[in-house]
């Protein structure tokens, strides 16, 4: 199986649940045709370089996956039919250097997702220092002068 990346832009006028449905649709096309998804990246809403079908912005997504070659034709066909996807680009990673870059990218996405899940929230109140620590640091500053 070969390594691929598909970037697609969804219309910005869609609601969040409709956008999620479009992403799930693309993921389903990949998995139904024998592909394995490594990572999905939501890049968010961004300004387009030029207007596409009267839109100046779009919601960007990138999916890293491995798949047999025949899947790409089916994926492209489905992306062209879907009117809510205004642009797409499929990239094939061929040589060892490109494949290692693909692995780093897809692995890096997984790591950043795990880090977001494991992040601790900041305390609501600031942590107070003891008055003694403040006095000691002031004494050190005055002694250095």
Curated annotation (Swiss-Prot):
Coiled coil spans: none
Task: Name the Gene Ontology biological process terms.
Answer: translation
Q: Where on the tree of life does the source sit, at the highest rank?
A: Bacteria
Gene Ontology terms: cellular component: cytosolic small ribosomal subunit
* Bias (Basic and acidic residues): 113-132
Q: Where is the composition biased (Acidic residues)?
A: 133-145
Stretch list, region Disordered: 113-145
Q: Which GO terms describe its molecular function?
A: small ribosomal subunit rRNA binding; structural constituent of ribosome
What CDD domains does this protein map onto? bS6
Q: Secretion signal: which residues? A: none
Which keywords does UniProt give here? Ribonucleoprotein, Ribosomal protein, RNA-binding, rRNA-binding
Sorted alphabetically, which InterPro entries does this protein's record hold? Ribosomal_bS6, Ribosomal_bS6_sf, Ribosomal_S6_plastid/chlpt, Transl_elong_EF1B/ribsomal_bS6
| Secreted is among the record's keywords | no
State its role: Binds together with bS18 to 16S ribosomal RNA.
Checking HAMAP family in the record gives: Ribosomal_bS6
Q: What is this protein called?
A: Small ribosomal subunit protein bS6
Instruction: Identify the species of origin.
Output: Campylobacter hominis (strain ATCC BAA-381 / DSM 21671 / CCUG 45161 / LMG 19568 / NCTC 13146 / CH001A)
